[in-house]
Amino acid sequence: VLLCLMVFRNADLGIHTGQSTMLLALFFVIMTVCPHLANQFSPVLGMLLNIAALAVLILFGCHNPSMFNQSTLVLGYLLLYGYDVTGKSYQMRLVGMALGAALTCFVFYRNHKNRTYKRNLKDLIQEFDITSSRTKWQICQILCVPIVLCIAELCNMPRAMWAGIAAMSAILPFMEDMHYRVRKRIVGNIAGVICFTVLYFLLPSSI
């Protein structure tokens, strides 16, 4: 909630403020309900639900890659997925998310109501073009993140959400940036494993 509030007080969705505000409310509903439901299903069924949920978040909330709204919406979704709760705790989460949605929408509308946007929700749908680099990036996010999550869960990896977060952060709108980040991440991961292994054997077990 705090992340959304801090981001969307300045960032926008590139369309009419009223429609953007309604979309924000919808995003909160999706982030509140879908991660919890996906955790109740098998990894494969959960993957399908995650694909559907992320499709709405990314296609309508991440239309402008330069805003990096995926770092807010997709990250928030994955964190809620990874730290799922049940019972009384989930009821408290519902209350917290509802209050957070109301506050975020209020701040967003107040800060953007005087701005003029030429596009609306219909324009976002019409601009979906499978041949454009933006749409290809969106589809890659929509499909790859849930697939990586599913694979991690099928392999019984603890906190599979971190695999999804790693995939999300590596899938960038511009191909040259993505290639650069992936190369650097491979080198960094190898160096990290080596350092951890060395420290594991050098440091006393009492630490």
Predicted segments with their positions:
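Alpha-helical transmembrane segments and their membrane-interface boundaries
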Residues: 1-207
